[in-house]
Structure formats: C-alpha cells, structure tokens
Amino acid sequence: MPPMTPTQVLPDAVRDLGRVHHIALIVRSIEASLGLWRDALHLDLETVMDIPDDRVRIAFLGVGESKIELVEPTDDSTGVARFLEKAGEGFHHVCFEVANLAETLLRLEIDGIELIDSSPRRGAEGPVAFIHPRSCHGVLVELIEAPGGPAWASLGF
C-alpha cells in the first residue's frame, strides 16, 4: 500500500470546502450599486458597514444560501483602491465556508498552496483568511470559518 499524503491523514471535514459564502464585487459606490443589486434584482440588503482596519465599506446582500458582497474602498492608497483603478468595477474574490479554518490553512500550507494569511483573522462576518491568486489560477479566494468554529472564540466573536 502506498504511503499516505499529508492531506489523506487529516479528517475529511478539514479537506472539504463548504458552501460558497459570498462572491465579492469591487464597486466605486455602494449606494449607486444598490440600485441594481437591491432595487432591480431584489436581493435582500443584510448589512452595510465600515471596516476601518481594511479601509473599505462593505454591503452584504442575500441570495439563496449565499451572499453578494459589495466592497467600496475608502482610501485611495489601499490594495482594493488600486485594484479598482486598474481593473474597474467587478469580480474581486470568492469566499468558501470551512468547518475549521486553522486546520484548513495548515492543510493548504502542507499541500504547498500560497497563503496571504497563514492564520485566521477577524473578518466582517467571522474568522477569515485569504489564499493567494497565484495558487488559484489568478482568483483571490477567501475562506471563512462556519459559525461556532474554534477560531470564533479566540478572535473574540
């Protein structure tokens, strides 16, 4: 029998991604964007909030079991603002829910996946971490821990 790879040694729950939590779009103005997403497409506006540490303003709109996140930069010197200037409005990242974020990050690191965040950090809706686009065919991937997971208490949620 061939030796097990590091991924095979870990529990199934660590290997499996959950649902798509949200798709994030970069916009110049959340208010202007709500004319489409909330008013024309009738998505439910769940929240609008400032994230001072990231220098962005965000809005979440519910769609089925997932969400659309609108991200508006509040400072022209941020990576989000530079992305908006270079690429224009549109797709920014996809976010998947995982049961245990720290274990998932460890598994990804063992598998040689380039991470932006090697440990969970506070996000707007729970513990999050990002995978570098170089490891994901040019797509920025966010992971968010499912409610009640181990990182929630350690990050003060």
Question: Where do the language-model regions lie?
Answer:
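C-terminal "cap" of GNAT-fold acetyltransferases
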Residues: 51-67
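Short loop/beta submotifs within extracellular cysteine-rich repeat domains
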Residues: 33, 44, 68, 76-79, ...
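Short, flexible, solvent-exposed loop/turn segments with mixed acidic/basic and small polar residues
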Residues: 11-14, 81-86
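Short, structured motif recognition centered on aromatic/hydrophobic residues
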Residues: 20-27, 37, 61, 68-71, ...
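Vicinal oxygen chelate
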Residues: 2-14, 27-35, 59-60, 69, 74-75, 86-157
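Long, hydrophobic N-terminal alpha-helical segment
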Residues: 5-56
